[in-house]
Amino acid sequence: MRDKNISPRLVPIIPDEARTFGMEGFFQKIGIYAHEGQKYEPEDSAQLSSYREEKSGQVLEEGINEAGAMSSWIAAATAYTNHDIEMIPIYTFYSMFGFQRIGDLAWAAGDSQARGFLIGATAGRTTLAGEGLQHQDGHSHLIASTIPNCVTYDPTFHYELAVIFREGLRRMHEKKENVFYYITTMNENYSHPEMPKDKNTEEGILKGMYKIKDFNKYKKTKIQRLGSGTILREMI
């Protein structure tokens, strides 16, 4: 959003209140889009990150309306062909309230050759355990896999996400491939390591598997562990 060359193309879309995702900072920095501006005093007006609606706002905050949010995403994701304007829509949602609720619209996005990013936040079975099974997502990737032009990833660390996003932008906006990305993320608080120095790391991330660390090479017993998302940290 700080890059003036790319920020006008970005379309951040959020259902619900966005605070679970730690994205409330957007409210004051770039504002929530409202075609008539703000007509009320928000409940949290005394807070630094209170709701701020503007005619020039950029965040599409659709409330508890996943179908509406996904429809907005499809509109932006197909603007390249309908309006000859390339946009970068990024729809961030509770991963249990994504494909499980709007799978038909996700399929329609594939049919429409949409280009953009879907971020299934709060993914994994440990992220929001206090709220019960409604946020215990361990299967949204199975549903996403039924859409042929949906590219899916379940990263754990920041460098993985950066590599995936860069490749997504290259494929969709440089190579003009008709694909869209579904990426699951977590809201757990943990430290992120540096990207491994191995020259094959970036290629491995994009292929879906890369080496993070070696176990003791002098031991006779060799264990190979494969994991992603929330469970990867426990495996390490």
Give the location of each predicted region:
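Thiamine diphosphate
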Residues: 1-194, 200-205
